[in-house]
Amino acid sequence: GEYTAIAIANPGGMMMEGSESLSTQMSSPRRVTVSGADVTGVELALEPLAAISGTVTSEPAPASALKDACKNPPRFYKEEIVIDARGEAKSKPEDEVLRMLNAFTRTTPNDQSEFTIGFLRPGVYRPEAQLPGENLFVKSMTLPPAAPSEKRIDAAKTGVRLKAGERVKGLILTIGEGAAGLKGRVVTGEEDKPPSEKTRVYLIPAEPDAADTVLRYFEADVTVDGAFSLGNIPPGSYWLVSREVTASDQDDAARNPLAWDAGGRLGLRFEGEATKKLIELAACQRLTNYVLKYSPLIKPSKASKKPPQ
């Protein structure tokens, strides 16, 4: 049969989450085929794992919003935020093993709002945050600039490239208050039925200066009854579009969010602008029962095998 071999060395004798696993070493996974006999000579080269460390800050909703929908916002604690780093998706069979180890990268800030995401193999990662309330959104995540005179680096846009054993420090994760939410359904045809094919919705920032703000892009799968839900959205102007999901894009673990790619963002904005329908989301607004009309792409018919007359 087919097997995946991987070696893990931890001086403490146990794998722990976050910063506790900074001294762990791991090999790249190797595919091994066993055909009725012992397999020898499999080499697994250990290399030190990398880490990203930083702090969490927060910004309250604007004073004007506190008088209306954001009045008396619920209190939250930074220690409740779950922080992770998502690597670029790969579809190799051996990467299934690495995905099972992702639980060890998750961490939470300490009482000083500091965190360390450990247990990371070489590659490009984008930090992510699971927020403890619908009133919150990720406003920015930045790294120190290469030179003091330059601006901080947008880690959500560029990702964080890690080498074996590298320790990247200084990530600032800023949490904003006053997030909006959007729920609705996608319908097709004259009878407003749910799409017959698997569909995904994309929320796209409409402001020109937000074209490359990756944290302003959202996507969600549409359920079989046509429903969708998007939350923790920064207030602003948006377009909403839907697309049929191709077979290669149905596995969330084996694909990247479309907004990670500059070309993906450009395509979404082109499609969104063509709708000429803006959605204005105010601070703390909960827009429900939104109906998005979707026109499925017409699949081309097969070419005739008969020669032209």
Task: Indicate residue ranges for each PLM-predicted region.
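Long luminal/extracellular ectodomains of secretory-pathway precursor proteins
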Residues: 1-309
